[in-house]
């Protein structure tokens, strides 16, 4: 009696008695229960001897990798070729299009020759798909456009026609998204017109928005990638008013032909309802891939990454707009300078023609002063204002709390409560006074650690979003603070010394020497340095009392005394040389050297010294930096002037800076580039690291101040609550005592 096969689970048995075979995508075999609804094949006794061998061959065949995707192995032609019994046949093949023929009309349709450029051909498919209209014309559109124009002077171009068709598609997609259910219910042109006027087709709306942000006015927004054809495209409002009604009828006809679908050519993709695997026009087929399980932690990380990416893109957009605005401003400045130059050229010709002679200051561009950013001063002002406001709110809250307590408590309880509060305040003040030295020491340690460890690597979570400052600004601020500190220290020391000490180290004066120069050395060529003059013989040295009278100019007579205290009479000098950094205000400062001297030799070796007065030039270069009239007014006035507001002191600092300061060191490298060179990183990275360190420090200080403020507020609230509870307990105890006495 024939028995059914033991391997019934290898495939589904068809209605005609034949099995479809084991699925090519499955290499595992699982025994299933025999179902009553399935048809089973019945084998005869003669088939049993070859049954096991066929089963093994079939398993071996399906375990071999075919090199074809598992979903594609079910295709009809591939399935026939991959069958066991069809491997030996020679007439089986996969149908492919015939590419051996030559298209005769190729030269007529495609003209022109391609020349290989010098550089690579650069393109971006994703970006080009988003630029311009999405609709592409075909042969029918070309014939209709030729009929529509009909030899008009202002004909509708192909680009404008594609813009109109794209606008119609966008408007109907927005107003009737389910038009495919009923294609005949298409809206009229009057209903679609308002939506079409609002739509942003292509990049026209984006360019208009960018032009408004950059304040270009009526100028067109032209980029480097715009072709000349796009620049000649008319406005959408004008196209709709002139050609909208006629193009609507043609578009409506095309829309009805495709049963309400999209008339824009697109690739055919498999939808969720389509399951036809044999359709060769499907470009992409869906795959049923099992989705991996995700935890909330992964979702949170992904959302944070997306949020950070969006923020970075916003920063990039703002940065690009700022760069564009800056370049536009620089271009406007160049154009204005060019106009000014042309006007100056015209003025020259006019003055020459009229014979006008005068100053030429208008023909020379004056130097502009460098603008100084006041970001640091604004930050300090905002922080001080915030601290003052917080203290004011705290005081108002204390006053309100005291008023509430005074209303609720009786007179005796109020006195008792006030005494308790006074004791608590005294204790807090004592604790604060005891803790103040510790806090100051901790702050000094923090400052020292911040100075010694400037560059600290922080995690991204602790880096706040701040505006980075330039290294030059930070270094200049540091240098100004150092100079101010030194000046304050010197001023303080001078005030402490007064008239008691005469400090020769801080206020040196040149001693009066009579140097005997050897006869073989010319006095005109003798060096005047202290090292070389030590080789010469010094005859006598003197000291002079009452130097202040001589310095201030109250006396012209100078008395010199030798070491025995005797007055030495000498006609070689009338006034000693001196130098005092604290008495420089008493000297006369001019814009330029008042006189010039020239030494020349005459006959018989006679030396002559010629003096020449310097003519005053109204367009003095120093006048661009300093206002000498303001300095004179400030010095002549009797009002006390702050040391930081003194114009004369600013002139001294400017002179010293011009004389001694240098932006480069001995090796020719900028001082601002030294830290980056020391750390072996780029200067931009050094700027970011330094700014991050400053921002982190300020952020931590603000956080600590906020926490201290919150702790103080919570402590005050707790004190208030405890005082109220004590008051309630005392009232209850008094009531209980009264009840007991009653």
UniProtKB/Swiss-Prot annotation:
Predominant place of localization: nucleus
Keyword hit for DNA repair: yes
Cellular component GO terms held in the UniProt record: NuA4 histone acetyltransferase complex; nucleosome; nucleus; piccolo histone acetyltransferase complex
Keyword Nucleus recorded: yes
Compartment(s) of residence: Nucleus
A GO MF label: histone acetyltransferase activity
UniProt-listed Pfam families: EPL1
Region (Disordered): 1-28, 416-446, 718-742
Subunit structure: Component of the NuA4 histone acetyltransferase complex.
Protein name: Enhancer of polycomb-like protein 1
Organism (species): Eremothecium gossypii (strain ATCC 10895 / CBS 109.51 / FGSC 9923 / NRRL Y-1056)
Species classification: Eukaryota, Fungi, Dikarya, Ascomycota, Saccharomycotina
Protein's gene: EPL1
């Amino acid at each position: 009696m024939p028995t059914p096969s033991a391997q019934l689970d290898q495939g589904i048995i068809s209605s005609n008695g034949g099995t479809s075979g084991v699925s090519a995508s499955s290499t595992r075999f699982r025994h299933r229960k025999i179902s009553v609804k399935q048809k089973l094949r019945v084998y005869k006794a003669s088939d049993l001897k070859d049954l096991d061998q066929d089963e093994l061959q079939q398993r071996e065949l399906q375990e071999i990798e075919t090199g074809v995707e598992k979903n594609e192995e079910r295709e009809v032609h591939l399935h026939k070729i991959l069958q066991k019994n069809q491997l030996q046949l020679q007439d089986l093949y996969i149908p492919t299009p015939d590419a051996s023929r030559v298209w005769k009309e190729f030269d007529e349709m495609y003209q022109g020759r391609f020349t290989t450029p010098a550089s690579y051909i650069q393109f971006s498919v994703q970006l080009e798909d988003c630029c311009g209209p999405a609709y592409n014309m075909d042969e029918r559109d070309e014939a209709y456009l030729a009929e529509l124009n009909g030899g008009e002077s202002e004909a509708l171009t192909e680009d404008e026609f594609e813009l109109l068709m794209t606008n119609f598609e966008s408007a109907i997609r927005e107003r009737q998204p389910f038009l495919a259910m009923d294609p005949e219910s298409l809206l009229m042109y009057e209903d679609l017109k308002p939506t079409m006027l609002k739509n942003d087709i292509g990049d026209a709306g984006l360019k208009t928005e960018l032009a408004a942000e950059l304040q270009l006015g009526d100028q067109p927004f032209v980029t480097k990638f715009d072709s000349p054809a796009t620049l000649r495209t008319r406005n959408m409002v004008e196209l709709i008013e002139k050609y909208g009604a006629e193009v609507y009828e043609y578009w409506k006809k095309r829309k009805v032909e495709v049963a309400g679908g999209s008339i824009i050519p697109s690739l055919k993709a498999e939808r969720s309802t389509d399951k036809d695997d044999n359709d060769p026009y499907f470009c992409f087929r869906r795959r049923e891939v099992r989705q991996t399980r995700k935890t909330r932690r992964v979702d949170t990380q992904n959302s944070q990454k997306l949020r950070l990416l969006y923020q970075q893109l916003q920063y990039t957009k703002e940065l690009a707009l700022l760069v564009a605005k800056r370049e536009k401003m620089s271009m406007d400045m160049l154009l204005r300078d060019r106009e000014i130059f042309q006007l100056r050229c015209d003025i020259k010709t006019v003055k020459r023609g009229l014979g006008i002679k005068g100053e030429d200051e208008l023909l020379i561009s004056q130097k502009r002063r460098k603008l100084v950013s006041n970001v640091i001063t604004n930050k300090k002002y905002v922080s001080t204002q915030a601290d003052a406001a917080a203290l004011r709110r705290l005081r108002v809250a204390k006053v309100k709390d005291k008023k509430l307590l005074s209303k609720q408590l009786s007179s005796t309880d109020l006195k008792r409560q006030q005494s308790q509060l006074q004791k608590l305040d005294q204790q807090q003040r004592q604790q604060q006074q005891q803790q103040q030295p510790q806090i100051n020491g901790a702050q000094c340690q923090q400052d020292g650690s911040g100075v010694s460890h400037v560059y600290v690597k922080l995690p991204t979570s602790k880096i706040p979003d701040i505006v980075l400052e330039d290294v030059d600004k930070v270094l200049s601020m540091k240098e100004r603070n150092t100079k101010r500190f030194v000046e304050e220290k010197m001023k303080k020391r001078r005030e402490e010394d007064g008239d008691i000490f005469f400090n020769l180290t801080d206020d040196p004066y040149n001693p009066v020497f009579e140097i005997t120069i050897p006869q073989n050395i010319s006095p005109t060529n003798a060096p005047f340095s202290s090292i070389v003059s030590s080789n010469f013989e010094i005859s006598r040295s003197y000291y002079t009392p009452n130097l202040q009278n001589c310095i201030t100019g109250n006396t012209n007579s100078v008395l010199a005394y030798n070491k025995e205290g005797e007055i030495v009479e000498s006609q070689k000098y009338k006034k000693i040389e001196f130098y005092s950094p604290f008495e420089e205000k008493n000297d006369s400062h001019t814009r330029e050297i008042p006189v010039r001297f020239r030494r020349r030799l005459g006959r018989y070796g006679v030396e002559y010294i010629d003096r020449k007065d310097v003519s005053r030039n109204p367009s003095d270069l120093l006048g661009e930096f300093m206002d000498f009239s303001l300095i004179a007014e400030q010095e002549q006035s009797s009002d006390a002037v702050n040391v930081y507001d003194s114009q004369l002191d600013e002139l001294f600092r400017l002179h010293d800076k011009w004389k001694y300061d240098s932006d480069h060191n001995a090796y020719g490298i900028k001082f601002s580039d030294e830290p980056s060179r020391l750390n072996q990183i780029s200067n931009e990275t050094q700027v970011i690291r330094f700014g991050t360190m400053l921002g982190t420090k300020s952020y931590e200080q603000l956080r600590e101040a906020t926490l201290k403020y919150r702790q103080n507020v919570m402590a005050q609230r707790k004190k208030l609550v405890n005082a109220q509870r004590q008051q309630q307990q005392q009232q209850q105890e008094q009531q209980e005592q009264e009840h007991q006495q009653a």
